[in-house]
Amino acid sequence: MANYTAADVKRLRELTGAGMLDSKNALVEADGDFDKAVELLRIKGAKDVGKRAERATAEGLVAAKDGALIELNSETDFVAKNAEFQALADQIVAAAVAAKANDIETLKAAKTGDTTVEQAIADLSAKIGEKLELRRAAYFDGTVEAYLHKRAADLPPAVGVLVEYQAGDADKGKEAAHAVALQIAALKAKYLTREDVPEDIVANERRIAEETARNEGKPEQALPKIVEGRVTGFYKDVVLLDQPSVSDNKKTVKALLDEAGVTVTRFVRFEVGQA
């Protein structure tokens, strides 16, 4: 008897772009373990698996103010465009600043007007008849550049970035930090440096690269060099300082920051509908 359902196959196809038969076979080989099935499809060459697997289903918006960034979810984009929903997000991000809230539990308990953030969300949810959720929050207390991006002109911002930085020259610092925020919004860096990437994630990427190269029939003696090349490519995808700059792809983000005398100390990126 199969240890997976038709819904599992459908979800795996949506996340990975793989065909029905490949998805079924991956679930069989993984003994019903969904995450393992995704990994097997990566090894076998399904396109964009890693990027698609990050997706979630949600609508809503991101809002930023004075070092704070929040994501507030709704069930539909109709509500995301609602003026009261957007006003609530503004109230919540202001509360995040006042409370210096770096997590949703702290922020839910924070005051907004004569109530709490949690109650304000519940009140609007009851009024409009749709589930609303405060999904995540971040707060940086240093010098911060924020950037918000809209997916469509008639929708509120769906991508938000905070970049905390240090700079000797305020104007150069702000200019460089803004460029970095745009970079993060577009290329979705997850880590600041290579050292920030967890060892188990690097080891897993190395293993997948080796298995993929073997499946492609690469000669055994060439595997170490191929694997290192693919791991380097992985770093360029996920590590901010290793990425080619969108403003000058002949230079890395690190090189451009060094030229400007700017140090990025941390960053965060929220995107509605993604993990």
UniProtKB/Swiss-Prot annotation:
InterPro entries: EF-Ts_dimer_sf, Transl_elong_EFTs/EF1B, Transl_elong_EFTs/EF1B_dimer, Transl_elong_Ts_CS, UBA-like_sf
Superkingdom of this protein's organism: Bacteria
Region of interest (Involved in Mg(2+) ion dislocation from EF-Tu), ranges: 76-79
Cross-link Isoglutamyl lysine isopeptide (Lys-Gln) (interchain with Q-Cter in protein Pup): where in chain: 36
CDD domains reported for this sequence: UBA_EF-Ts
Main location: cytoplasm
A Gene Ontology term for the protein's cellular component: cytoplasm
Location(s), subcellular: Cytoplasm
UniProt name for this protein: Elongation factor Ts
Source organism of the structure: Mycolicibacterium smegmatis (strain ATCC 700084 / mc(2)155)
Gene (UniProt): tsf
